[in-house]
Design a protein with these regions (language model features):
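A short alpha-helical cap/connector motif
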Residues: 1-146, 154-179, 183-216
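Active-site residues of response regulator receiver
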Residues: 150
Length: 216
């Protein structure tokens, strides 16, 4: 049951309530998602009212991996309205402390994400940075344990996912994870090149989720 969080690993009622609210409120523009319909606008500001987020099964996996590795510093690109940030921040809190460094370009979504984190009781575990991730994520402040790269499909190369993984790769510690939701070809090319220090696998979550581990 892809959209059902009742059987997931999160037990905190406030956190679950926020996630369930975001799932129930999820909607797709009448013109379709820009990742599926290349003919529609790809300007992220045209979608300020829409939260393009991970699905709960992806979030459950993200949470479990962060708990298992005792992650304390994670990166969330792009934060959108905060669904993935809530999963990350819950793991940071339950690990005993840590920080989610989020990046979101659209100011309205930054405000919404911060509000959702506060509603979940997790605001103290998140630093949501407003602006272009190519600048906001240039310094994560220390070794990164986990990075979600779920950025905007700009329809060109290099994709934002490729640019962001190139920025983050030197900051991700050996043994750290990267999850990607959109399977941008040039992102996959980067993480599947052994010279870049990653190994990866495509998981049958959503329409295909790439999970990568930095091994060198």
């Amino acid at each position: 049951m892809q959209n059902d969080t009742r059987l997931g690993p999160l037990k905190d009622a406030r956190v679950r309530a926020v996630i369930e609210r975001l799932v129930e409120a999820r909607r797709i523009p009448s013109s379709g998602s820009p990742s599926d319909h290349p003919e529609v606008s790809r300007d992220p500001f045209d979608y300020a009212e829409y939260g393009f987020s991970i699905w709960p099964d992806q979030g459950d996996l993200l949470y479990l991996l962060c708990r298992g590795m005792r992650a304390t510093r994670v990166v969330d690109f792009a934060t959108s309205i905060g669904m993935s940030a809530v999963y990350f921040a819950a793991a940071m809190r339950d690990n005993g402390g840590g920080i989610v460094i989020g990046s979101e370009l659209v100011p309205e979504k930054v405000k919404t994400a911060r509000r959702n984190l506060a509603d979940a009781g997790l605001a103290d575990y998140a630093d949501i940075r407003e602006g272009d991730a190519r600048q906001t994520l240039s310094d994560a402040g220390g070794p990164v344990d986990f990075a979600l790269i779920d950025g905007w499909p700009n329809g060109q190369e290099p994709s934002l996912a490729r640019e962001v993984i190139e920025i983050l790769a030197p900051q991700i510690r050996t043994g750290g994870y990267v999850m990607n939701d959109n399977a941008e070809p040039d992102f996959l090319q980067f993480v599947r090149d052994p010279a870049n220090g990653f190994i990866s696998v495509t998981l049958p979550l959503k329409r295909g989720t790439e999970l990568c581990v930095k091994v060198s």
